[in-house]
């Protein structure tokens, strides 16, 4: 019996509501394991996970590493800075070299959109996209959804306002796809210069005012101003951006009283979010980090168990 009909996790696009629910239910079980004193299982014993990060990462790489190790996999982190890539080797050559080592899953983060999909075409193991350019970041969307569902009890019919640098955000794209698939009502709030062309065609409501966009929102998801991906002047100044699009306690009052405050990290305090909000009672930013490990455990077991020998008795229950 195939529990999950996909060999890879390249993006949220292509996943059904049932696929997403399956992964979230599986992740709920992983949360229980992560909160035990004895956190390690033997579910993926004897299997190998290679983390291939071409972009700097702290949270995501550590989260994937911890997820694999808690499931008993052998985990290798490849340092791109010291690799053959720096000597001119192409992504395909690197992929073929690693594939010859017979890993069971490759986790890749790359600055180019489509890198994970390309890798999946060239290797015989499963591939998980840990972020590819401005395209997608599927496990971030899944962990955000898990955080919301555990706090609100559902994803359907809730209002989620995604605010900030939507243009450069793969997190925004994956969240929009997932939340729409699960029946949520999605808003984006940003200056016109930080919205991609055709954003309204993705099934979202577009706002240019924080007060209007946050009105009656159940969830406020702030995005980092990604200045490293900007080649021009997208905002007049950081100070002006914060004045109009930063989230402080006063601005948050426009949302529902019990609205969740989220941020995928890393945060720029005083740029898109005030410390009083990031550290406040409505913030679930720390919970997002915890849910990240659980979601990645669920993804790893789902892909590797489906691909290999079927469910083991000590695995996660969905």
From Swiss-Prot:
Q: Which organism is it from?
A: Rhizobium leguminosarum bv. trifolii (strain WSM2304)
UniProt-annotated binding residues for L-aspartate: 87, 170, 224
Binding of carbamoyl phosphate occurs at: 59-60, 109, 137, 140, 265-266
Q: Would you identify the family this protein belongs to, as annotated? A: Belongs to the aspartate/ornithine carbamoyltransferase superfamily. ATCase family.
Q: Report the SS bond pairs.
A: none
Pathway the protein acts in: Pyrimidine metabolism; UMP biosynthesis via de novo pathway; (S)-dihydroorotate from bicarbonate: step 2/3
EC number(s) recorded for this UniProt protein = 2.1.3.2
Protein role: Catalyzes the condensation of carbamoyl phosphate and aspartate to form carbamoyl aspartate and inorganic phosphate, the committed step in the de novo pyrimidine nucleotide biosynthesis pathway.
Q: Where is the signal peptide?
A: none
Recorded catalytic reaction(s): these are: carbamoyl phosphate + L-aspartate = N-carbamoyl-L-aspartate + phosphate + H(+)
Name of the protein described by the UniProt record: Aspartate carbamoyltransferase catalytic subunit
The taxonomic lineage of its organism, from the top, reads: Bacteria, Pseudomonadati, Pseudomonadota, Alphaproteobacteria, Hyphomicrobiales
GO cellular component labels: cytosol
What is the protein's quaternary organization?
Heterododecamer (2C3:3R2) of six catalytic PyrB chains organized as two trimers (C3), and six regulatory PyrI chains organized as three dimers (R2).
Its Gene Ontology molecular function terms? amino acid binding; aspartate carbamoyltransferase activity
Q: What are the protein's UniProt keywords?
A: Pyrimidine biosynthesis, Transferase
Name the source's superkingdom: Bacteria
- The UniProt entry's coiled-coil ranges are none
What does the record list as GO biological process?
'de novo' pyrimidine nucleobase biosynthetic process; 'de novo' UMP biosynthetic process; amino acid metabolic process
Matches recorded under InterPro entries? Asp/Orn_carbamoyltranf_P-bd (IPR006132), Asp/Orn_carbamoylTrfase (IPR006130), Asp/Orn_carbamoylTrfase_sf (IPR036901), Asp_carbamoyltransf (IPR002082), Asp_carbamoyltransf_Asp/Orn-bd (IPR006131)
